[in-house]
Amino acid sequence: MPFDRPSRQSYRQTVTVLSLEDLAASTPPGTPWLGLDLGEKTIGVAASDTTRMIASPLSLIRKTKFTDDAHAVLKLMDGRGASGLVIGLPLNMDGSEGPRAQSCRAFARNLQRIRAVPCAFQDERLSTSAVERFLIEELDLSRKRRANVVDRTAAAWILQGALDRIRVAEQT
């Protein structure tokens, strides 16, 4: 995939960060979405099924430099036929955005410069904590084994939350 950088004016037109409802309306039915949990060292990746009912952990990308990370995400999207991304947005407990949330927004913005991918943000407050608690209490995984699954499982948690939110919105 070439790195054609759009002009500032055309760049504004290619940015496709949407609300979850608009993401659902603008992506073809029968295509999965990917969910991302952007950590400091890794990117957890999850995928939905084609009905967008169930999210499952998919992969873990070890972060290197942005272009490599972006290409890894886009390769997974292409391989799964995914039409959209749900990116976890780590809000503070009071709902404000701190440095980690700004970093996630920057990732989405920079990804759009490579390819205009429809994406939306999903509040991910406490997702990693909830997943770790589940892995400890329910599955009794050791710290070492948890480290290998927590980020991609958190991505599935984030994506499942978005899918559930869309389903509830469609029923009302």
PLM features: what roles do these ranges have?
Residues 3-6, 10-36, 41-172:
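Phosphate- and other anionic-substrate recognition elements at nucleic-acid/protein interfaces
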